[in-house]
UniProtKB/Swiss-Prot annotation:
Keywords: Cytoplasm, Methyltransferase, rRNA processing, S-adenosyl-L-methionine, Transferase. Pfam families: GidB. The gene is rsmG. PANTHER family: S-ADENOSYL-L-METHIONINE-DEPENDENT METHYLTRANSFERASES SUPERFAMILY PROTEIN. It comes from Ureaplasma parvum serovar 3 (strain ATCC 700970). NCBIfam families: rsmG_gidB. GO terms for molecular function: rRNA (guanine-N7-)-methyltransferase activity. Its main location: cytoplasm. S-adenosyl-L-methionine binds at residues 58, 109-110, 126. This is Ribosomal RNA small subunit methyltransferase G. GO terms for cellular component: cytosol.
């Protein structure tokens, strides 16, 4: 029922908030719900742990954070989105779905980390940036022994090679790589363990991340 209502809310507000070009029933279920859930369904710590704190960076229309919250109801969810209009939509969405334990922040990730360092068990995102960039802006949010979960396409291997310096600098270790197909789409999901506290100089300002990748 919640996913049917979620679909209806997307279709109702799509033109107002410019959410997506995929507004048919089939495309919303496939591209929003099934494809966004697929990378996480193989990760057993979602079902083994209760009250996990998760931050979804660049949440947009609620993918994957709201989808995960619908399935794992005990999840303490933070949705981080820099676009103000999409934050307005996220507020409407979570209210109409009746979701509890959800915080919505209209900020850039590198700004919010100053007040929420080492606060979450899991950080994740979908289609926000290349792996080196998203790891840099995500790592400081996560507690030591927490996880960064990054769904990627077949380009994962290429992106991880470029990210090797930032992975080392931020004391991250890839502990799993989930490789599977879902409806003709090849998912590669990197799961990184955070082994030490993130150095205070990270994340750097976004313009510096873009201009001077490590």
């Amino acid at each position: 029922m919640s996913f049917e209502k979620y679909k209806t809310i997307i279709q109702k507000y799509n033109q107002i908030f410019n959410l997506t070009r995929l507004d048919s029933d089939d495309k919303i279920y496939q591209n929003f719900f099934l494809d966004s859930l697929a990378p996480y369904k193989e990760l057993d710590f979602f079902t083994q742990n209760t009250n996990l704190k998760l931050i979804d960076i660049g949440s947009g229309s609620g993918i994957p954070g709201v989808v995960l919250k619908i399935i794992f109801k005990n999840l303490n969810l933070t949705l981080l989105e820099a676009n103000q209009k999409r934050c307005e939509f996220l507020k409407i969405l979570t209210q109409e779905l009746g979701l509890n334990d959800v915080l919505i922040w209209n900020m850039r990730a590198e700004d919010l980390t100053q007040s929420m360092r080492e606060s979450f068990d899991i950080a994740t995102s979908r289609a926000v940036a290349s792996l080196d960039k998203i790891l840099e802006i995500s790592a400081a949010f996560v507690k030591v022994n927490g996880y960064l979960i990054q769904p990627k396409s077949i380009k994962f291997y290429e992106e991880e090679l470029k990210a090797k310096n930032i992975i080392k600098t931020l004391y991250l270790e890839r502990i799993a790589l989930k490789d599977f197909w879902e409806n003709d789409y090849h998912h590669l999901v990197g799961v990184y363990l955070k082994k030490q506290i993130t150095p205070l100089q990270f994340p750097r300002p976004w313009n510096l991340i873009l201009k001077k990748p490590l």
